[in-house]
């Protein structure tokens, strides 16, 4: 039986009649934001798997802002499995000094494209904090970078060590995760063209990036590791960072670790250039140092540089930070990163930064 989970009436019918949940009066609230899902917060009179407040995500087959950008609804199955895998391996991914968590996955309904998970509470994203005036302190930014770096390195270790196990092999089938990355890479050439950049390396790089993301089985990657998917939880005095939540695991798949590197570090470069140089730089340096200390395989600096370049070209225009001239300058920096990666130039601007900062272990 299917329900219209885009409406409150349909949602209530689904929760009460299909799942037999005791929903609190006025307990349903639609959450804003999100590119591809209709998301609800639901308060309950009686606990569901130990929780009296839950989040329900209803997958849509296209971007909220662009119905022509198609994205398969089966992605929710991969998010649910990712949450289960990370939770089951929390002792390997973290330790007493790691504050990174994911919400608990509670239920997945393939018929209604519904994913129910733990409600971790209302909090701001890392993106909110780095764009605030004033932004978070450099000390907090450094802590975030260090924590995320350690967690992602251990995720990459875990993926490499378990790729032959069925519950990990499952992620190789995330075609949505692969094709979404392909669609994003296809924006590189037109994004560069907006700023009058027509470099013969662009189609070569796009082809290489697409081929790799469509075929790589190197390790398990989060694949959407940017500041909008990182929630920061502080203590009641708003002074101590107590927990970092990584959310939106729909694109989790087997693929190149450079994709995770490119997303997070590319975000750090954007923040440093357009928001706060010290915050962005501190976060980047801490991430690289922590990632290098925890990862068991050598970092491929050329691929990481290409991933950062892709992020800069794909997202500089989208974020609309700075003026046209400043954005053009930064898109050019992304294109130059492609040349660095293609030549494996350790003395290039971005590559030299990566090598230097990752070696500070």
From Swiss-Prot:
Pathway: Secondary metabolite biosynthesis. GO terms for molecular function: 4-hydroxytryptamine kinase activity; ATP binding. It catalyses: 4-hydroxytryptamine + ATP = norbaeocystin + ADP + H(+); psilocin + ATP = psilocybin + ADP + H(+); 4-hydroxy-N,N,N-trimethyltryptamine + ATP = aeruginascin + ADP + H(+). The pharmaceutical interesting psilocybin as a treatment option against depression and anxiety is being investigated in advanced clinical trials. Keywords: ATP-binding, Kinase, Magnesium, Nucleotide-binding, Transferase. ATP binds at residues 37, 57, 118-120, 248-250. Signal peptide: none annotated. Gene3D superfamilies: 3.90.1200.10, Phosphorylase Kinase, domain 1. It holds the Pfam family EcKL. The keyword ATP-binding applies. The active site is at residue 224. One of its GO terms (biological process) is psilocybin biosynthetic process. Its cofactor is Mg(2+). InterPro entries: EcKL, Kinase-like_dom_sf. Its EC number is 2.7.1.-, 2.7.1.222. Monomer. 4-hydroxytryptamine kinase; part of the gene cluster that mediates the biosynthesis of psilocybin, a psychotropic tryptamine-derived natural product. The first step in the pathway is the decarboxylation of L-tryptophan to tryptamine by the decarboxylase psiD. PsiD does not decarboxylate phenylalanine, tyrosine, or 5-hydroxy- L -tryptophan (5-HTP). 4-hydroxy-L-tryptophan is accepted as substrate by psiD as well. The cytochrome P450 monooxygenase psiH then converts tryptamine to 4-hydroxytryptamine. Belongs to the methylthioribose kinase family. This is 4-hydroxytryptamine kinase. It comes from Psilocybe cyanescens. The gene is psiK.
